Amino acid sequence: MCSSDLIGVVAPKEWDAIKASQKLKVNWTQVSDPFVDMNQIYDHIRNAPVTKSDKNEKGDLAAAFAKAAKIVEAEYEWPFQSHASMGPGCAVADVKADGTTTVWTGTQKPHFAAQGVAGCLGVPVEKVRAIWVTGPGSYGRNDAGDAAADAAVMSQLAGKPVRVQYMRYEGHGWDPKAPASIHRGRAALDAQGNIIALDFNSKGFSRLETNSTEAEPGDTLAGMFLGHKGQRTQAFNLPDNAYTFENKKLSWETVAPTLAGPSPLRTSHMRDPLGPQITFASESFIDEVAFAAGADPVEFRLRYLTEPRDIAAVKAVAEKAGWKPGKAGTRRTRRGDIVTGRGIAYTQRTNTIVAMVMDVEINEKTGAIRVPRVTVAHDCGLIINPNALKRVIEGNVCQGLSRAMHEEV
């Protein structure tokens, strides 16, 4: 079946559809603007023109840096990453002759998916009913909504209910990606090792190149190939923490997408929308500044926190982990080829405070990394379902470790 640039194979049995799709021979027109070489992606981001920017600034950074006893600078890189849910997107759609449509989907926002499906089908949204069913997970904006739109278009063409189940390589290849980005930190220290100014900038592809709501047909794969235009909003994020520096500038900049048209390299929200990227970089930088100041990483963070809940979370995780005060970089111990260290990170998101201490072992001979213990302080206010929260925390730890070590695409 073919509608505009959307091609699909429908068969009574899944394996028959797979075999038939593998035998298709399709001639595509080559686009004029190819992908950036992934080996050059960070240089591309550094040099690309800025499409949009925003900042949060207070104090006089220029004066503070001019009188600094020491200046610390660092840069961090974050690659494109797939949402990589436990299973790729799947949906079932039943489009009747009069346009009445039912879609069964595991997307995070079925109400918005119904709007996107209606746009792809050219029917009023009142005719579309989206029923949420348990899926493999939805982490920001994965491929679940795309599967719903694909199934609906195929059902409309076939005149029968259609189930779309992406192959694993399709899910990894075509789902919206976490945007690649670079993050630069610059801090001014006085003679006592205190931060008197901090400048932190993130630059990368937009977190809303593909809108996370799926409400517009152009923000779904099917809609893109049917010729619909997406919203293509330019946006990134600022670090989400409560550090109080007298002089501070937090800023972000976005660059244009690598392709202007339908593309398998679409960028969108990753988890909270960009918490992993920004927290990784901003907290790594706080550690580097603590090291330059000769300070303990826990004590150094507490210097700049004033909110009771933030302070309590950092203190609680340090106590539970058995944190022993000492200069940053001095916790390394050795047992044969195994070097052990520990670190702390803290962040907040929508009034939830999280602090974490992680013990890490590295085999210097083989390069193998092992994390024997993770301690988490998680203050989200009133807890309604302790078991669900426990799973959220454990899932965050597992996914964070996996993304840190394995999931560049």
What is the predicted role of each segment?
Residues 1-382, 406-409:
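Structural alpha/beta core scaffold segments of enzyme domains
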Residues 383-398:
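Conserved phosphate-binding loops in nucleotide/dinucleotide-binding enzymes
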